[in-house]
Design a protein with these regions (language model features):
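Terminal leader/tail segments of proteins
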Residues: 2-11
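Cofactor-/ligand-binding subdomain signature composed of acidic, glycine-rich
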Residues: 141, 259-295
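Protein-protein interaction/assembly regions in multi-subunit complexes
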Residues: 34, 38-39
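Short, structural beta-strand-to-alpha-helix junction motif
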Residues: 25-29
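Fe-S ferredoxin-like electron-transfer domains
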Residues: 54-241, 245-249, 257-258
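Serine/threonine-rich, repeat-prone extracellular segments and beta-strand-based repeat modules
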Residues: 41-48
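Short strand-turn-strand beta-turns centered on an Asx-Gly dipeptide
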Residues: 13-17, 254
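Short linker/helix segments within small regulatory modules
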Residues: 47, 201-203, 263-269
Length: 295
């Protein structure tokens, strides 16, 4: 929900660089105007900010009349902080790096070492953020938690609870985007996990999108599972032909054979989402019975 409807602007300072942005714009979006990226897990620009993962912490202060900066005692979540006149932001300080390392260390305490077999490996935000911001070694020596793995939420979506970092993206998608409210969190605290009501099937026409927005490989495609690694794929832009909407999509191929569909951004048609018919209804693409020459 990064868009700001009004045209009123304000001046903020980001890493000592003055920047004019729409008033109320979230800081996580404002810094992109300077080519900066703040690491995120729970934030998604098309959904309301919740500040659940705390990965986007930045130092914040306000400019004083004498030119000095009065800093807040604790870092703030950039995904929930709106821009206002005189706001001062620091994204690259020792405190920020220390806090990001701490957040990642807590997330990795119980995260399984599944990277070599995880379908998200190679295109995983958790991998990338750990490489750039995380600790190089683990101090955790105890036995990790064990939760159900490869749990079928539906015939299309597989859930691995050990990998879940409780970012809430999947739950919020069903509430705010698809509107079917199929997923919710059950239990509380460290035991919190996404689930369907009374453990019924995840019945949604748009369930495949939660696979794409999951930042850690907790939700994976049952059809794509263990079929390829990202660096083995050839990706081409395409239009879905399963209905007249003609959603913009990405086609992924491996060794000349089709393996996966992902949504492609097109603000005028499908934003970035796909329906399950377009995402999973592609078995016939590789069928040997397809016509390859005119009749």
């Amino acid at each position: 929900m990064a868009a700001v409807p009004n045209t009123e602007t304000c001046t903020i300072l980001v890493n000592d660089v003055e920047l004019v942005v729409p008033k109320g714009e979230l800081i996580v979006e404002s810094v992109k105007r300077l080519g900066l990226e703040i690491p995120i897990f729970c934030y998604h620009p098309r959904m309301k900010p919740v500040g659940m993962c705390r990965m986007c912490l930045v130092e914040v202060g306000t400019k004083q009349p004498d030119g000095s900066v009065r800093k807040m005692p604790k870092p703030q979540a950039a995904c929930t902080l709106p821009a206002s006149e005189g706001l001062v932001i620091y994204t690259d300080t020792e405190m920020v790096h220390r806090d990001r390392r701490g957040v990642l260390e807590f997330l990795l305490i119980n995260h399984p070492l599944d990277c070599p077999i995880c379908d998200r490996g190679g295109e995983c935000p958790l991998q990338n953020n750990t490489l750039f911001y995380g600790p190089s070694t683990s101090r955790y020596l105890e036995i990790k938690r064990h939760l159900p793995k490869a749990y079928p939420l539906s015939q299309y979506v597989t859930l691995d609870l050990e990998r879940c970092i409780q970012c809430g993206r999947c739950v919020r998608f069903t509430e705010e985007i698809s509107g079917d409210h199929q997923l919710a969190f059950r239990f509380r605290g460290a035991s919190m996990q996404p689930s369907t009501f009374k453990l019924t099937d995840f019945e949604s026409k748009f369930s495949g999108n939660v696979i794409e927005i999951c930042p850690v490989g907790a939700l994976t495609s049952a059809k794509y599972r263990f079929r390829a690694r990202p660096w083995d794929l050839e990706t081409k832009p395409a239009q879905c032909t399963n209905c007249s909407v003609q959603c913009s999509i990405w086609f992924d191929y491996r060794s000349g054979r089709f393996v996966r569909v992902n949504g492609r951004t097109n603000e005028f048609v499908n934003e970035e989402w796909t329906c399950d018919k377009g995402k999973f209804g592609h078995d016939w693409y590789n069928s040997e019975k397809r016509l390859t020459t005119p009749l």
